[in-house]
Design a protein with these regions (language model features):
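DNA-contacting interfaces and partner/effector-binding or oligomerization modules
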Residues: 1-27
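Short alpha-helical segments that sit at the start of domains
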Residues: 37-65
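Short amphipathic alpha-helical elements of helix-turn-helix/winged-helix folds
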Residues: 66-70
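Short acidic, hydrophobic short linear motifs in intrinsically disordered regions
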Residues: 73-85
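Short amphipathic alpha-helical interaction segments
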Residues: 87-102
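A short, conserved structural fragment
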Residues: 101-111
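Short, cationic-aromatic polyanion-contact patches
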Residues: 111-133
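Amphipathic alpha-helical dimerization/coiled-coil segments
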Residues: 132-156
Length: 156
């Protein structure tokens, strides 16, 4: 019977730590998280110079990060731009974008300046989830994907 109180105490400590980490992450300045997302995207693009982008592709995450940064900069993102951010063929990117829309992670709206163009943005819930996730990585001391020096990849 003494195991139950000890286990409950351990669970309580773990929960307290998770709450503290989440509060610390929430207290971070949004600009810091935007910079973190921007650096992550830059690191992923740099990696693509050395390895086949399809090999390490994560189109949904690339789209979400791109939209997250664009949202912080108040820049509209077209469907085409979001596809380009994914670093996969356009048809594949459109399928991923459709899935993200179906899951209500992104929202499509008509561009008021160009009625024939559709703008893509993060849903409020997804923006909050991306912020919380990036904040948790920062609170764990995990940096964004490294950006390598601007050296052309070796050929041959």
């Amino acid at each position: 019977m003494t195991q139950i109180p000890a286990r409950a105490e351990r669970i309580e400590r773990q929960m307290r730590k998770l709450i503290e980490d989440a509060e610390r992450a929430a207290a971070m300045h949004k600009g810091d998280l935007t910079d973190y997302a921007r650096q992550t995207l830059a690191g992923r693009k740099q990696r693509d110079r050395y390895f086949d982008p399809i090999l390490f592709s994560n189109p949904a995450w690339d789209i979400l990060l791109h939209l997250y940064v664009a949202d912080a900069e108040a820049k509209p993102v077209s469907v085409l731009d979001s596809c380009l951010a994914s670093t996969v063929p356009q048809g594949v990117a459109l399928r991923w974008l459709g899935y993200l829309k179906q899951e209500e992670m992104v929202i499509e709206i008509q561009d008021p300046a160009r009625p024939r163009q559709t703008i893509v943005r993060l849903s409020d819930q997804t923006r909050s989830a991306v912020s919380a996730y990036l904040g948790s990585l920062v609170s764990l001391g995990l940096g964004p994907e490294p950006v390598m020096p601007d050296i052309p990849p070796a050929r041959g």
